[in-house]
A protein has these predicted regions:
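Conserved metal-phosphate-binding beta-hairpin within the catalytic cores
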Residues: 1-21
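Domain-scale recognition of functional cores that engage charged ligands
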Residues: 6-8, 23-27, 34-269
Length: 269
C-alpha cells in the first residue's frame, strides 16, 4: 500500500491511495547508504528501517500473502510482472527486489504479461510454474489483451496475484475518495464526530463528474483537479485552471473525479 500525501500548512492531505506503489526497495537501499555515510540524516529516517530489518520483513510479506490466499506447501517461484519491464523507470527496483527475494531462497523471474502461458498445471513462464505474481501492471482490472492470460489465471485461482483487481477496487479506485470526503457517509459508518473530522480534514473534497454537475465544475474549474477514476499517476490528469474546452468535453462524458486542488509542497534545492 502507498499513500500519496501533499503536505500543507494545515497538515497532510491524502491525494490518492495506491496498491502498487513503487520505490520501497530503492528507498530502503538509499536509507541504508545514508545511515552509513551521513549521520546527520539519521533523525530524518523512519525509525527501524534498515537493510537488516527491511529485507526479512519484505520476504515474510510475500510468504504471508501466499498463505493468506489459502495456499499449502512452500512458496517457490515469484514473477515480477510489468509491461516491457526493462524499459520501466523502476526497472532497477525490479532487480533489487529479485536479488532480495533470491537471497531468501525464492526463484524469481522478471517478465511482461505477454510472456506468460496458462496450463492446467498453472501459470507458466518458460515452462516454469509461477506460484505468485508481484503485479506491477497499471492495467488494474487486467482488461487489456496483453493481460488476459494473467486475468484468466487469477480468476481461475491458478496463481496468487498481488496486488489484484479486487484489492485495487477496494482500496485504490479514486471514487473511494468521494466516500472518504463525504461527512454523511462517514457518519453512517458509526464514526465519532472527532474521527469524522480527522478524516475530512485529511481528505480533500472529491466528487464524481457527470453530465448533471459538469457545468458547475466547469465554472469552478480553477478550484479543482480532475483525474480518471481508475487512472494512475499523472496520466490524463488535469489541473482545472489549465483545462481546454476540448479536454473538458471528454471529462464531462464521465469516468473522472474532481478533487479540491491541493498543491504539492515544494522544497528549495
Amino acid at each position: 500500500m502507498g499513500y500519496d500525501l501533499h503536505v500543507t500548512g494545515n497538515g497532510p492531505r491524502l491525494i490518492e491511495i495506491n496498491t502498487n506503489a513503487g520505490g520501497a526497495f530503492l528507498n530502503a537501499l538509499l536509507a541504508d547508504a545514508q545511515t552509513q555515510c551521513c549521520r546527520e540524516t539519521r533523525p530524518a529516517l523512519v525509525a527501524g528501517i534498515s537493510q537488516d530489518t527491511f529485507r526479512p520483513r519484505i520476504a515474510r510479506m510475500f510468504e504471508e500473502e501466499w498463505h493468506a490466499q489459502d495456499r499449502a506447501g512452500e512458496l517457490e517461484c515469484i514473477a515480477i510482472v510489468d509491461d516491457e519491464p526493462e524499459e520501466q523507470p523502476l526497472f532497477p527496483e525490479f532487480l533489487a527486489a529479485r536479488t532480495l527475494l533470491q537471497e531468501h531462497g525464492y526463484e524469481v523471474v522478471i517478465a511482461g504479461p505477454e510472456d506468460l502461458e496458462l496450463s492446467p498445471a498453472g501459470l507458466l513462464f518458460e515452462a516454469r510454474k509461477i506460484d505468485l505474481v508481484y503485479n506491477r501492471l497499471v492495467d488494474f482490472s487486467l482488461d487489456r489483451p496483453e493481460s488476459r492470460t494473467l486475468q484468466e489465471a487469477y480468476l481461475s485461482d491458478r496463481v496468487v496475484l498481488s496486488p489484484n483487481p479486487h484489492i485495487h477496487a477496494l482500496y485504490a479506485d479514486k471514487r473511494n475518495l468521494c466516500l472518504l470526503s463525504d461527512p454523511d457517509w462517514l457518519a453512517s459508518c458509526g464514526l465519532s464526530e472527532r474521527e469524522t473530522k480527522v478524516i475530512l480534514d485529511a481528505v480533500p473534497k472529491t466528487a464524481i463528474v457527470d453530465r448533471e454537475n459538469a457545468e458547475q465544475f466547469w465554472s469552478e474549474r480553477r478550484d479543482w483537479f480532475f483525474k480518471p477514476a481508475r487512472g494512475y499517476g499523472s496520466k490524463a490528469a488535469y489541473r482545472g485552471a489549465k483545462l481546454t474546452k476540448r479536454v473538458w468535453s471528454e471529462i464531462a462524458e464521465g469516468g473522472y473525479v474532481a478533487q479540491r486542488f491541493t498543491p504539492p509542497s515544494t522544497r528549495k534545492v
